[in-house]
Amino acid sequence: MENIYLLMLVALVALAVADLVVGVSNDAVNFLNSALGSKVLSFRTIMIVASIGIFIGCVFSSGMMEVARKGIFNPGEFMFNEIMIIFMAVMITDILLLDFFNTVGMPTSTTVSIVFELLGASVAMALIKIGMDNGSFSDVVNYINTSKATQIILGILLSVVVAFSIGAIVQWISRLLLSYNFETKPSWVGAVFGGIALTALTYFILMKGIKGTSYAKESFDLIGGVTIKDFLENNVFQIVIYTSALMSLLSYAFIQFFKFDIYKIIIAVGTFGLALAFAGNDLVNFIGVPIAAWQSYEAWTASGLAANEFGMGVLATKVPTPNILLVCAGVVMVLTLWFSKKAKRVVKTELDLSNQGNIEERFEPNFLSRGLVRLATNSSNLFSKIMPDSVNNKIEERFRVPETFTKAIAKEDRPSFDVIRASVNLMVAGILISIATSYKLPLSTTYVTFMVAMGTSLSDRAWGSDSAVYRVAGVLNVIAGWFGTALIAFTAAGTIAYLINISELMIAVLIFFAILLLVRNYIKGKKVTTNGVIEESLVIAESSSLQGVIHESAKNIAKLIKRGNKIY
């Protein structure tokens, strides 16, 4: 029987590599969105900055691996054979679930997926054990960390409301103060904005960067004999004040003397920070389970006991993750970032929803999106009636969109939004995640970054009268997908754990089935990409002739009428 668990371990290692690929493909949107959307940095520069952030974040993520070992279930209640079944069920489910979201181009939370997969598989195994012992359903609480699921669900709701609201408010104020003609403002204006943004991002990088390192809990005489983590958390006000002054002076020097674009620096630093946070936090979602399985296997083989007699209390102890594994994971993640086409598909979804210009909308409007748009429109009209005309005219002038987003320029050269919105996206996301880290709140980086981007899009008037119902419908679809992730992850992992428990042969069947689905999704995705390229080339070829222009204009008019019918 020892061979079956060795084979399971080998399978888990292979699944870990695949999970890294599908996981990075989905989570890349969190840190690439702002840089790619603003188009102020070259694609190569963006990828290099993000790659460095990911690699450093991976090395710093050792402390986060405890989540897969004891964060969701109580390992001492399970035997080695049961733990291995739970881990197999989790990894198979995770790959299929994330690949599905990648294929349809929808962002989701890898944290929520892994948490609810662990929860579903461990609940299923607990119920099997309870049934065999003739226990009661209430005994499940002895096996499961029930408070964790509640925290995650509350985290989803909190992320959606808070991130969206704060993003919208900060963007509205930023646009009101800076307008779209921010380049004509005095140097000190850009310096103050740069100082605030870089301070937020620096604190964010420090909070997220040191959290998983071995230095986080070490004390140093230089900072009064306290740990770095405690120093950062207990001296927030002083750190922010001093850093803001320093960063504002540096920003002024960059603008005035070195003629640097401070917004490029903000976007580069923000991209690095979010990439570092993603790798540091989310690496556990991809390799935490296989590493826990490997450590369980080592402890079991050393014990000399039968698999169904060896309790897994060993997982409750803290065991450091070998750095070589973290480095290897970092290499896989960086390679995936550079070569994954599905990552670009997920990024496109978020960029389309936040685009300042007119695009071909992907999502169809529904009664809920129409209702929300009407409510927002009526509220805006009421606000306009209350305010004096002079104030309204001043606001309109500040929010007047430049030709960059409206004139007919090549689609590939047109930015989705400007550097002010990109900077606000990164700054607000960094602040919210830093606060969540400080107070140990279970906020997902995916939820925060996505909802901040949607909030800034709303207040920046990217959702016009003709596109609002489409964009709101898209946001609602993504949010529904988040809740669907939790439900599907819990149910599927529990079902797979039950099937594997019936017979270990089901592992081979399930892995074969998973491979078939992955190949099918890959082929399907490739066909969609190819068809898109062919269709685009045909439109360009037609537009070069007079008749082609007439046909294209007719299509646009038909689309406009159809869109008007859907809106009203």
Model-flagged regions — what are they?
Residues 2-441, 449-566:
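Alpha-helical transmembrane segments and immediately membrane-proximal extracytoplasmic
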Residues 446:
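Classical protein tyrosine phosphatase
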